[in-house]
């Protein structure tokens, strides 16, 4: 296919480089989706923890459920802090491919762990297809496989870190 000269980005034959140059920023943007998934999980399970009664009390009073809440809260805030820090590096023009990939890797895997815990916390209700937590769980899985799998992200991070080592 012939591309008019006025539509060519960068130099001829370097289109892949132009395309790849935006991937680091895309990875940071996608990382924000992971934090949104985790926040949605917390928003869904908190009212459930209060409303659902077992043995005459809210299940949120059980230590194991409190531990789930604590783990979700901690992962959410850890991922959010990392995403914000890498986003600030983007704003300063100091983004690294390893940080962008690590950010989306951590955020997506944390989102999957959190979504799994949200389903667990809600039991059978959380697994039903018509509940938000079930949809969130499926969305979280997509974060691990869409726009590059976790395995590809790990390979990229390892390669970037090794290439940065002095010879």
Where are these regions (language model features)?
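Long, acidic (Asp/Glu-rich), low-complexity accessory segments flanking structured domains
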Residues: 1-17
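Alpha-helical interface subdomain recognition
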Residues: 12-14, 18-167
């Amino acid at each position: 296919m012939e591309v008019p000269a006025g539509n060519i980005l960068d130099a001829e034959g370097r289109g892949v480089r132009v395309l790849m140059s935006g991937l680091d920023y895309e990875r940071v943007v996608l990382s924000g989706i992971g934090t949104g998934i985790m926040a949605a999980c917390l928003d869904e399970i908190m009212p459930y923890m209060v409303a659902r009664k077992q043995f005459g009390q809210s299940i949120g009073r059980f230590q194991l459920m409190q531990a789930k809440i604590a783990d979700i809260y901690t992962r959410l805030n850890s991922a959010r802090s990392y995403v914000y820090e890498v986003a600030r590096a983007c704003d300063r023009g100091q983004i690294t491919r390893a940080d962008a990939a690590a950010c989306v890797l951590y955020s997506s895997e944390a989102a999957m762990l959190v979504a799994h815990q949200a389903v667990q916390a809600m039991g059978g209700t959380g697994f039903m297809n018509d509940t938000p937590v079930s949809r969130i769980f499926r969305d979280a899985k997509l974060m691990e496989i869409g726009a590059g799998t976790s395995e590809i992200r790990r390979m990229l991070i390892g390669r970037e870190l090794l290439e940065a080592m002095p010879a």
